Amino acid sequence: MKLKSLAVYSLLLLTAFIYSCKDSSQFTINGTIKNPGSLRLVYLIEADSTQIKVVDSTTLGENGKFQFKHVAPYANLYKLRIGSAGGGEQSAGANNVFDLIAKNGDDIEFSTDNNDNTHTYIIKGSDDSEKIKEFNKISNFYGEKNSKLVAEYQEKSQKLGKQSDSLLKVYMPTFQKNLADYGAAVLKFVNDNKTSLAGFYAATSLDVYKFEPQLVAYSDDIKANFKDNPGVQTFVRQMEKIKPVSIGHKAPDFTVTGIDGKPIKLADYKGKYVMLDFWASWCAPCRQENPNVVKQYAAFNSKGFNILGISLDKDKAAWQKAINDDKLTWAHGSDLNSFEGPTETLYHIEAIPSNFIIDPQGNIVAKNITGADLEAFLNKTFNKVQ
């Protein structure tokens, strides 16, 4: 028994010694490309959310093997891009790009078969790389679904010889459902992987307009993690800026100058539902949405729905003309200073159209909803049977 215990103890010591000899100042990737064909060059690309750049390159050996040793200032997303000789980095096709996450001390093994049309690859030695591979499966699955749907729609449109609104109405619900399903699947992956960088990179694929409350909450959960990763910290700072004007928070008060030169305060709408509608006369999407806003105002104003239009125009005459032309009969104000106005800065307006719906208690209850989504929200809020 003593000899057996000694042998086990010696094995543990040997294992500890081997691991202690690993180089923690850099990470290593040992790769194998089976059936490489014309593929000769491999590029290591740093690809976090702040930059994308080639940091190293090498040539495949005759046996399809390659190796990278690279110092990572922090755990980060990288891509392996495999291309043909003489074609440069751009010669690599989209299917010959593989994601991984690496940090110093990682000893990663990578392999793929160039003859495999599914572009399956195996990666060992990095749990985060396995997770980013899992996320890519989700992304590719829904991407392929919508690509097929778009191709089918385009084929039928070509047969008709024109784009058809009725045909679009047939395909659009499925397209939107696929996007919604994708968002739900990604959000689940993100919340299941809060301690992994893979979760963060998945989160950056979500539309902040549609998933703002979830992304703000996620940012709070991870801000103590990955402190040395600039991409993560930039995301955290962005969410902290948005948070005060995110859904569920009190809308910050402001005073804006009305079209008649008199001050308008958000506090004037205390106890009422009001939509802050940020727009401009020069904004084509805003002008396209205005007929819908006019329609909803006509339907719900008598039920308690108010609008305060806030223009990003600098030209008062153009602003006034757009109000008259589009028949916008609600109150209007502007700082006449585009995105640099104090109201726009307070509400972190970076694109228009943008809107905030505020309830009688002064809470932001919806943001950036347009078209049918705006009508559905108002129907639900004011208990109108659809």
Name these PLM-found stretches:
Residues 1-32, 383-386:
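Bacterial Sec-dependent N-terminal signal peptides
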Residues 21-174:
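A non-transmembrane, solvent-exposed segment enriched in polar/low-complexity residues
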Residues 95-97, 107-108, 168, 176-247:
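N-terminal targeting signals for export/organelle localization
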Residues 205, 328, 335-383:
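Thiol/disulfide oxidoreductase modules built on the thioredoxin-like
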Residues 234-266, 330, 376-384:
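N-terminal "domain-start" segment that seeds a small globular fold
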Residues 270-271, 278-295:
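Conserved redox-active cysteine motifs that mediate thiol-disulfide chemistry
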Residues 287-326, 336-345:
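Structural microenvironment flanking redox-active thiols in thiol-disulfide oxidoreductases
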